[in-house]
Structure formats: C-alpha cells, structure tokens
C-alpha cells in the first residue's frame, strides 16, 4: 500500500510539473521593463518554434530562455 501511494504521489508531481511547463510555453514574449538589450528565446505557439526576442532585463514572464536549446527542451515537441 505504501508503494502505491508513493508511486501515485510521484506521478502527481510529474503531471503538475509538466502542466506548469506547458503553461509557460503558451505565454507571449515579454520584453520586460528594463532598458537593457539581451537576446533571449521564447516559444512561439503559432510557429511551433523557439524564436529570438530582445529582453530588457527586468520583469517579463517565464517564457524567456537563455538558449534556444533550453527553449526547445522545455517547449518544442519534435524538432525545433
């Protein structure tokens, strides 16, 4: 019985993590409020690809990745 509860708990946390990652990928790119000019990557749901945008350095949202590889790993399904 304890093994079943442990497995159920692990599956629940995996599902919650997956769902929150997908919500992140549905957000639009957000330059933030800063005045910096950093090249970052976001997942574009319309194109199904990770694309670049200029990030201001402050604020924004969680659809903001340092590398294309990070963006693809979290958001892209299939090739990126």
UniProtKB/Swiss-Prot annotation:
Record localization: Secreted
Site (Key residue that directly interacts with the S1 pocket of trypsin): 35
GO cellular component, as recorded: extracellular region; extracellular space; host cell membrane
Molecular functions per Gene Ontology: potassium channel regulator activity; serine-type endopeptidase inhibitor activity; toxin activity
Cleaved signal peptide residues: 1-21
Chain coiled-coil ranges: none
Tissues of expression: Expressed by the venom gland.
Domain BPTI/Kunitz inhibitor: 25-75
Post-translational modification: Lacks the conserved CysII-CysIV disulfide bond but contains 2 cysteine residues at the C-terminus that generate a new disulfide bond.
Classification via PROSITE patterns: BPTI_KUNITZ_2 (PS50279)
Matching Pfam families: Kunitz_BPTI
Top-level taxon of the source organism: Eukaryota
Role noted for this protein: Serine protease inhibitor that inhibits trypsin at a molar ratio of 1:1 (Ki=140 nM).
Misc note: Negative results: has no effect on chymotrypsin and elastase. Shows weak inhibitory activity against mKv1.3/KCNA3 potassium channels (inhibits 50% of currents at 1 uM) (IC(50)=1.58 uM), Kv1.1/KCNA1 (inhibits 25% of currents at 1 uM), and Kv1.2/KCNA2 (1 uM inhibits 25% of currents).
Family: Belongs to the venom Kunitz-type family. Scorpion delta-Ktx subfamily. Delta-Ktx 2 sub-subfamily.
Protein name: Kunitz-type serine protease inhibitor LmKTT-1a
């Amino acid at each position: 019985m304890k093994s079943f509860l442990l497995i159920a708990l692990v599956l629940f946390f995996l599902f919650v993590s997956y769902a929150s990652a997908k919500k992140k990928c549905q957000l639009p790119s957000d330059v933030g409020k800063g005045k910096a000019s950093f090249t970052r990557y976001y997942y574009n749901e319309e194109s199904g690809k990770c694309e670049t945008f200029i990030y201001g350095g402050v604020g924004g949202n969680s659809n903001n990745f340092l590398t294309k590889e990070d963006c693809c790993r979290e958001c892209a399904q299939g090739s990126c």
